[in-house]
Design a protein with these regions (language model features):
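Outer-membrane beta-barrel initiation region
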Residues: 21-132, 193, 208-242, 310-312, ...
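Transmembrane beta-barrel strands of outer-membrane/channel proteins
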Residues: 74-76, 103-107, 131-141, 146-149, ...
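Outer-membrane beta-barrel transmembrane strands
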Residues: 86-88, 92, 150-189, 218-226, ...
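Residues on the lipid-exposed face of transmembrane beta-strands in outer-membrane beta-barrel proteins
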Residues: 88-92, 117-121, 167-173, 185, ...
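Extracellular loop and loop/strand-boundary signature of outer-membrane beta-barrel proteins
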Residues: 104-105, 152-157, 211-217, 253-259, ...
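Outer-membrane beta-barrel translocator domains and adjoining extracellular loop/strand segments
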Residues: 114-119, 143-151, 193-202, 241-243, ...
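Outer-membrane beta-barrel translocator/channel fold
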Residues: 129-170, 290-309, 382-405, 412-419
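Extracytoplasmic gating/loop element in the C-terminal half of outer-membrane beta-barrel translocons
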Residues: 276-351, 356
């Protein structure tokens, strides 16, 4: 808990220091139109690029309020699913938006599959309270695992398959335009572990064979889980933020209902701050994150629930899920320039580590690199990042922003822990 509070203080410090660096000139009022407003860039944008972005924006949307009917459900799966995923979705509002239902399915490049159905009451208590429920089934076919600890070896790379069903209820109360509190509770039907499968297998050994003694490799129980959170969000746009910040604190519990071996508690603190240096043409982004686990005597954290570091959103110079352990600390900084109206260039530096004990956490694992972001005014349509760490170069193609903060959503996957 002490480390949780320290990390929360660090996140607040990031916000304070970033605010101190911000220009004294008041920012322009938020834009409310779509991608047709010019944002500016160092170079004139080719007409074909602008038309292509507008076409995608028309069919996929631009981070605006969801519209009724069928829609393409694209992206948003966990690290390692492959560079693209998609499938059909359908949503419908009833009674002037008082009731919302949604269903979607996706298949990814590597055969990851997800299906979900959601029922929500989004406008209770004067549009401040949202209450909902969701059933989610998922089958992740090739999740990477390197063993536990900061000293795990790259040569120990293995894969496993994870299938599970989770049913949960959630609620969120919006105190004002930027502050909300929330909670969720659910039942995770015992995760099924197996041999990897699906297209584009890379020939790595099976985790069940390489790490048979790691916690959770044998029997998998049902879990009753729940958490509470406090969130402050002042970003101008969720999908392509250029100003504002996002700060979150979460406390959760996961209760083993069958074996009495894997009950644990988790605490998270996370902060992101966007600092416009020259309007929206040059933006600095800072990200800090800490995750801490506690267990009672005789209990352990299953390996698929262990905080993990490495991949497209954290240490971009390392493989996905490169480091696992009970506790995690990470910080990163990114500088973005508008090259064209719809393309930003970026350079970044990431640092972090994992540890069994909170007192052993440090930021000794580092990576750096550069990338490009294709976006509308409100949403990131795609990005490529090239990162370098002590284990070489890594290239990432994704359909979201590296600061998308997927784990903040109450309806996302419970397992595995995906950075």
């Amino acid at each position: 808990m002490r480390a949780f509070l320290l990390t929360a203080s660090l996140c607040v410090g990031i916000a304070a220091s970033a605010a101190a660096q911000a220009p004294t000139t008041p920012p322009p009022p938020p834009r409310t139109s779509g991608s047709t407003e010019p944002v500016g860039g160092l170079l004139p944008e080719p007409r074909a690029l602008g038309k292509a972005v507008d076409y995608v924006d028309h069919w996929v949307g631009d981070d605006s309020e969801s519209k009724d009917g069928f829609y393409p459900s694209i992206g948003g799966l966990i690290t390692g699913a492959g560079w693209i995923s998609g499938g059909p979705g359908f949503r419908k509002h009833f009674h002037d938006g008082q009731i919302f239902v949604d269903g979607a399915a996706q298949v990814s490049w590597r055969g990851y599959k997800v299906g979900q159905a959601r029922f929500e009451l989004p406008r209770l208590v004067g549009d401040r309270l949202t209450v909902g429920s969701q059933a989610r089934w998922q089958d992740f076919t090739q999740i990477e695992y390197f063993g536990i600890g900061a000293d795990s070896l790259e040569a120990g790379r293995s894969v496993y398959r994870l299938k599970d069903t989770d049913v949960l209820g959630y609620a969120s109360y919006r105190a004002n335009d930027w502050l909300s509190v929330g909670g969720r509770s659910g039942w995770l039907r015992h995760p099924s572990l197996g041999a990897s499968s699906g297209p584009f297998k890379r020939g790595f050994p099976e985790a069940l064979d390489v790490f048979p003694q790691d916690p959770g490799m044998g029997q998998t129980p049902d879990f009753l889980h729940g958490d509470v959170s406090v969130t402050a969000d002042t970003r101008d746009h969720r999908g392509h933020p250029t100003s504002g910040g996002f700060y979150r604190a979460v406390a959760g519990v996961y209760s083993d209902r069958d074996l009495d071996q894997f009950t644990f508690r988790r605490y998270e603190a996370e902060g992101v701050q966007l600092v416009p240096v020259v309007g929206k043409s040059w933006v600095l982004a800072f990200h800090g994150w800490g995750v801490f686990s506690e267990t009672s005597s005789g209990n352990e954290v299953p390996f698929y629930f262990l905080p993990s570091l490495g991949g497209q959103n954290t240490l971009r110079g390392y493989n996905s899920y490169r480091f696992h352990d009970r506790n995690l600390l990470m910080a990163s900084a990114e500088s973005r320039w508008a090259l064209f109206r719809h393309i930003d260039g970026a350079v970044f530096f990431d640092a972090g580590n994992v540890a069994a004990r909170v007192g052993d956490l440090d930021l000794k694992k580092t990576s750096y690199g550069a990338g490009l972001r294709l976006h509308t005014q409100r949403s990131t349509l795609g990005r490529v990042d090239v990162g370098h760490g002590t284990e070489g170069w890594r290239v990432w193609f994704r359909l979201d922003d590296p600061l998308q903060l997927a784990r903040r959503a109450p309806r996302e996957e419970i397992v595995p822990f995906a950075p």
